Amino acid sequence: MHVTVEDQSTIKKVLHVEIPVEVVSRELNAGFDQIRKTAKIKGFRPGKAPMSMLKRLYKDQVHADVSIQLIQSSLPNAIREKALNIIGDPQINPSVLSEEGPFTYSATIEIKPEIDDIDFKGLTLKKPLYACTDEEVDHQLTLLRKNLAKLQDIAEPRPAQEKDAAIIDYQARLDGQPVADLPDEQEFHLRIGSGAIDKTFDQQVVGMTVGETRTFEVTFPETHGSKTLAGNTISFTVTLKSLKEEILPELNDELAAQFGPFDSLDQLKTEIRKNLQSGYDRRGEQELHEQVFTALLEKTSFEVPETMVQHELDGILDEIDRTYSAYNLSLEALGQTKEALSEKYRDTAVKQAKRHLILNKIIDQEKMAISDDELAEGFESIAKSMGQPADMVKQYYQGNPEQIDVLRYTLLEKKAMRIIIEGSTVEEVTPDPSSPDTAGDQA
């Protein structure tokens, strides 16, 4: 076997493989011999048909099978011979197999980039320390109260307000014609301010009184998910049929007990604060990690294999799809396409692939490994997050070796990041209060 490598880039190679004619002949003969044992040809007993007839009848089938067999048996050896650390599946371009000459094919492959040793020690970093405020705790309490809110008829007649629950009839017209995506509705339940139809629609309903009919126009944004509505001005005729207001439960110990094993409102507040602060702590860690990668990317340069980018992009799109599915939504219903999302998140996928490559380089560079004790700690951490016994989690992973490999690598990446930060100068800073808030989960 003769193998040559054509460089298309630092990470993209084309292997040109030539298999000698004597090997081709041997495999073809073996292929026809195998066919001869089972072929049913009129006038001949199994195994007795002449080779000339077999070649005439089964040439295409045997040549196709032998081509595949030659590629499958030779490609791993060719990759090992050239010491290539490939990523993903090769793209094969075979020649036409012939009995008279060698068999050749090319395999386009991607390889992991060769990254020089990275000097990751002595980075200067700033870790933002976010703190949960009393106002944020109060906001979460309000959200919890809304979960138990009751609707009741307004005590005294008044105009509709934000947050009211209204029942309305409406008609929608575009140039005087009905709108397919907004069919006429009777007894439509509208929470004013929710934007169920459009925020501007809700604003027009505010101020109406029960029994009133109002006609108004709403111009939908060009980016609206409905092609029928996007950029168009729709005329609505709305009749307010009834109005209820939201009554929140009192904020007391009894309320707290409805959200978990809390003996008092103060205990619930403490749990909310802990969860919010946990979210802020994660945000601070994430921003610190971003600084690490920004600093390390300035110290090295390399190409990223498209296979890795596509793998990260597939993960992002799968997560989006799962999120939409949880709310019974779809890309089509929201006016989005997989192609548009792929373009939108491609830079994110490239960045994630670079992160993995950098950490993998440092892991190899420092000869890091995960001990049995560290793996056990990983099981404990997963068990705690899932609310499951550690033994059950351990048993699951022991029955799934591939998942253990994934867990080990995840733990290795965390270990590498921890070592990088420990070797850095980290200044704790108070973040800009005008920056967007990111809070944790509520109780």
From Swiss-Prot:
InterPro entries the UniProt entry points to: PPIase_dom_sf, PPIase_FKBP_dom, Trig_fac, Trigger_fac_C, Trigger_fac_C_sf, Trigger_fac_ribosome-bd_bac, Trigger_fac_ribosome-bd_sf, Trigger_fact/SurA_dom_sf
HAMAP family: Trigger_factor_Tig (MF_00303)
Keywords from the UniProt entry: Cell cycle, Cell division, Chaperone, Cytoplasm, Isomerase, Rotamase
Taxonomy, superkingdom: Bacteria
Species the sequence originates in: Desulfosudis oleivorans (strain DSM 6200 / JCM 39069 / Hxd3) (Desulfococcus oleovorans)
Single GO MF descriptor: peptidyl-prolyl cis-trans isomerase activity
Domain notes: Consists of 3 domains; the N-terminus binds the ribosome, the middle domain has PPIase activity, while the C-terminus has intrinsic chaperone activity on its own.
Span of domain PPIase FKBP-type: 163-249
PROSITE patterns in alphabetical order: FKBP_PPIASE
E.C. numbers: 5.2.1.8
GO CC aspect terms: cytoplasm
Biological-process GO terms, alphabetical: 'de novo' cotranslational protein folding; cell division; chaperone-mediated protein folding; protein transport; protein unfolding
Record NCBIfam families: tig
Protein name: Trigger factor
Function: Involved in protein export. Acts as a chaperone by maintaining the newly synthesized protein in an open conformation. Functions as a peptidyl-prolyl cis-trans isomerase.
Family per similarity comment: Belongs to the FKBP-type PPIase family. Tig subfamily.
Location(s), subcellular: Cytoplasm
Reaction(s) the record says it catalyses: [protein]-peptidylproline (omega=180) = [protein]-peptidylproline (omega=0)
Keyword rRNA-binding: no
